[in-house]
Structure formats: structure tokens, C-alpha cells
Design a protein with these regions (language model features):
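Central hydrophobic cores of alpha-helical transmembrane segments
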Residues: 34-39, 219-228
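Membrane-helix interface segments
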Residues: 29-31, 123-125, 129, 218-223
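Aromatic- and glycine-rich beta-strand/loop motifs that create alpha-glucan
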Residues: 5-39
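Helix-loop-helix units of permease transmembrane domains in multi-pass membrane transporters
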Residues: 102-138
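Juxtamembrane helix-break-helix junctions at the cytosolic face
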Residues: 34, 206-219
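Secretory targeting signals
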Residues: 38-103, 133-206, 210
Length: 228
């Protein structure tokens, strides 16, 4: 009975600790800055890809165009878009923006002494678990939300036509490379998988920044070293 009560109290403190960390992670200026930077880049990438598509293929007689399967959302969304430098900038900066979102928080709280106040209300284990979960989710969101925005922008103007393997080498994601089978057979699942993978790695980068802060106390170094 006593063990059950203690276990229940541990769960409550864990939940409260996680809620606190999530609130801090998603309600700080650097998270918003990272998110805004990435959203601006992906929206610009979407607009440029739409303009490039219009210029290259035109939409006047799209239904009669034999190259219609090439002029598809799955060719022009940010993961496969080669019409501008914006997608490259997004993916190059992603490790930095992921770490900037909340990866620096532990080093800041350690230097300020805030962590001592936190550990009065919860255990060190709960604090660390909550910190890593919140950091991962914040890092994942600064990738997921901008990519979703890019997809929405492109999808408003370019149809989600299923890719045709007949035009194999007209696609960036041609057969034989990662997830190419999924790209040609179930493109929407490919799009979801690539978005989730990017978000996953973005969250991992953020957690690397957090892990580094156990050894390095400088906030700038903690944020930028995983990017390098």
C-alpha cells in the first residue's frame, strides 16, 4: 500500500515536471525565433518552387500535358525541391535552429542556480527525463511545422499527382535511393515518412545540445557545437 502511494506521488511529480518543462520549451523567445526563421525559409522555398513549376510546365493545358506526373507536389515540396537554394539553407541551418529552440536551457538553469529550486519540488531523475522530452519535442517542432507549411503552400498550386516510374530520372528521388519504392507506390506515405524522419533527427540534434551542456557550460558553445 505504501509503495503504491509513493509510486503514485512519483507519477504526479513527473507529470508536473514535464508540464513545466514543456511550458518553458514552447514559450520562450529562442523557440519562437527558431520557428519563425524556419517558417520563413520554407514558405519562400514553397513560393519559388511554385513559380518555377508554372514557368517550366504551365498549367493552361495541364490535363493534356504528358509530363504531368513530373509536375507534382512530391517533386516540389522542400525535401525534393531543387528549384532554389532555400531548401539547402533550411536543412543546413536545421541543426542550429533545433538546438537554439531549447537545447541551451540546462546550461542556463545550472549557471543561474534555478535548478536548485526545481530539485526541491521534484527528483533529479524526473527533471532530466522531462528536460530531454521537452528538448526533443521543441527540436522536432521547429522542423515539422515549417515543413508542413511548405507542403501546404506547394499543395495549393501544384497537384499531388502520383509519380510515374516511366519518368524515373526526371525526379530528384529516382529509383534505387532511400525510400524510392515508397515514393513511386505510396507517395503520400513517403512524404509523411520523410517529414517524420527530418523531425526525428531535428529532435535528436536538440538532445545532443542538451547532453553537451552536462560537460560544457557556455551557452553559445552548447548551441553551436552540434551544428558544426
Amino acid at each position: 500500500m505504501l509503495y503504491s502511494i509513493e509510486n503514485r506521488e512519483g507519477e504526479i511529480t513527473m507529470i508536473l515536471s514535464l508540464k513545466t518543462e514543456l511550458k518553458k520549451a514552447f514559450n520562450n523567445k529562442l523557440f519562437y525565433l527558431s520557428l519563425i526563421i524556419n517558417c520563413i525559409i520554407t514558405i519562400i522555398a514553397g513560393i519559388v518552387s511554385v513559380l518555377y513549376s508554372k514557368k517550366s510546365f504551365g498549367m493552361i493545358h495541364a490535363s493534356e500535358n504528358p509530363w504531368l506526373p513530373v509536375n507534382t507536389l512530391y517533386q516540389y515540396w522542400i525535401a525534393d525541391d531543387m528549384s532554389s537554394v532555400a531548401p539547402y539553407i533550411f536543412y543546413v541551418l536545421l541543426p542550429l535552429t533545433a538546438c537554439l529552440a531549447y537545447g541551451w536551457s540546462y546550461s542556463t538553469e545550472l549557471r543561474s542556480g534555478y535548478i536548485k529550486n526545481v530539485l526541491i519540488r521534484t527528483t533529479r531523475k524526473n527533471y532530466y527525463i522531462s528536460k530531454f522530452i521537452a528538448t526533443f519535442l521543441s527540436g522536432a517542432c521547429v522542423a515539422f511545422i515549417p515543413i508542413l507549411l511548405n507542403i501546404l503552400v506547394v499543395a495549393c498550386f501544384i497537384p499531388a499527382v502520383k509519380p510515374d516510374i516511366y519518368y524515373n530520372f526526371s525526379y530528384i528521388h529516382y529509383s534505387g535511393i532511400m525510400l524510392s519504392k515508397l515514393f513511386f507506390t505510396h507517395p503520400i506515405m513517403y512524404l509523411i515518412a520523410m517529414t517524420l524522419l527530418t523531425s526525428l533527427f531535428s529532435g535528436i540534434y536538440a538532445c545532443l545540445s542538451l547532453a553537451l551542456s552536462f560537460f560544457v557550460k557556455n551557452k553559445i558553445a552548447v548551441t553551436t557545437v552540434p551544428f558544426i
